[in-house]
Amino acid sequence: MARMGLAGAAGRWWGLALGLTAFFLPGVHSQVVQVNDSMYGFIGTDVVLHCSFANPLPSVKITQVTWQKSTNGSKQNVAIYNPSMGVSVLAPYRERVEFLRPSFTDGTIRLSRLELEDEGVYICEFATFPTGNRESQLNLTVMAKPTNWIEGTQAVLRAKKGQDDKVLVATCTSANGKPPSVVSWETRLKGEAEYQEIRNPNGTVTVISRYRLVPSREAHQQSLACIVNYHMDRFKESLTLNVQYEPEVTIEGFDGNWYLQRMDVKLTCKADANPPATEYHWTTLNGSLPKGVEAQNRTLFFKGPINYSLAGTYICEATNPIGTRSGQVEVNITEFPYTPSPPEHGRRAGPVPTAIIGGVAGSILLVLIVVGGIVVALRRRRHTFKGDYSTKKHVYGNGYSKAGIPQHHPPMAQNLQYPDDSDDEKKAGPLGGSSYEEEEEEEEGGGGGERKVGGPHPKYDEDAKRPYFTVDEAEARQDGYGDRTLGYQYDPEQLDLAENMVSQNDGSFISKKEWYV
């Protein structure tokens, strides 16, 4: 027993020594088995599992390549390549696994016709000497495409008045998918969907969705589509609902213009029903139909000319296998036909947008406001005094008329005749010349006795053209000319002053050509 213990201890030490030798041997860490980390494939398809040995050293000898599957913590051989023994594939892969390029550096295999049981962890192992075994593993996922379909309910859908309970109308199924698919609905209906997942023993999942709603007339002929999304695929299938409902009745034919003696009028009963209405019954609110009125199925004919006895409320009852509903119309008889007024030109041309009408009206209003403002401004400018309203600056005339405006006198004679006994002081001087004695004396005293005869004195000519005097100027002139006699001849050019003067509120006149500061 002691020998066996020593042998066991020696074996353990020898194994440890080999391991340390392999660990410190140069180039050991560069020897790597390369595989794909994960692979996936669909049931019934083929998948290639890559495996290669990288950077082999010349001193390292490869003896065997082995593929294994990890099952419940244990390893199960799948395929083996040995240079001396050849290729060996074990059951249940014998007919479905093959090496593509068997060699000491390439152990790639093909797994054909995938089954759900093929899913799992696969190990690729290279046996080397003296460094030992080198391996890597990959994960294979097997996917199953689901089978999808939609089916409507086998029960008859009937819309009933006052019904609030939702009933099953369609079922969408996505069966045996792996992983499970995503199911949804596409419709305008106001219903609700419920979902259920069933996990099958082989690992696949079946998804079932049921759609429920309250049957109604509005739901009839509406489309309901089932949408299944799986991996990169999208499935869509739809159906059209068939909902039975009782008739919805309307009466047509009365246009509001039934008048005396009108001919060839009728009423038609229209029933929206599923299945279609099979029976129609006409009555009036009073009971029986008037004389001259005949019912033929869904049409009510009025024979002969219209008279007042045909006025009243007419009722049509329509019946189908689901139920009976009625509709009514009130008929009025007038003495004369109603003739609508012809449409306006603008209406015939089409409605004018409100924005255009508002824009045109606003533009016209703006133009009127601007024109009115200009007119008011011009009138104020014409009738308003622009000068200084100080009490010191009153406006006087030029001494020959009130407020500075020359009066429109008839032309004066060139030579005025005075009696011989007239006072010399009252006689005017020669027309066209100066008539003031003091001015003559000033001219004689200061000007050497020379004076121009036959024309106005320059000073008086200048004063005559002035439209006004200030208060100071007026007082000064009153001192100098108060005792003198006017002998000035009117100049025709001064008559134009009246055309250029504007009347003021205080009775005075202001020239339009002057600005007063």
UniProtKB/Swiss-Prot annotation:
Composition skew (Acidic residues), residue ranges: 436-445
Extracellular face residues: 31-355
Protein's gene: NECTIN1
Modified residues (Phosphotyrosine): Y436
Pfam families attached to this UniProt entry: C2-set_2, Ig_3, V-set
Residue ranges, Cytoplasmic side: 377-517
Membrane topology: Single-pass type I membrane protein
Record CDD domains: IgC1_2_Nectin-1_like, IgV_1_Nectin-1_like
Every Ig-like C2-type domain range: 149-238, 247-334
Protein name per its UniProtKB record: Nectin-1
Cellular location(s): Cell membrane; Cell junction, Adherens junction; Presynaptic cell membrane
Assigned GO CC terms: adherens junction; apical junction complex; cell-cell contact zone; dendrite; extracellular region; growth cone membrane; hippocampal mossy fiber to CA3 synapse; membrane
Disulfide cross-links: C51-C124, C172-C226, C269-C316
Compositionally biased tracts (Basic and acidic residues): 449-466
Region forming the signal peptide: 1-30
A GO molecular function held by the record: coreceptor activity
Modified residue annotations for Phosphoserine: S422, S434, S435, S511
Any single biological process term in GO: cell adhesion
Primary location: membrane
InterPro entries xrefs: CD80_C2-set, Ig-like_dom, Ig-like_dom_sf, Ig-like_fold, Ig_sub, Ig_sub2, Ig_V-set, Nectin-1_Ig2
Disordered as annotated region, ranges: 399-488
Membrane spanning stretches: 356-376
Domain of life: Eukaryota
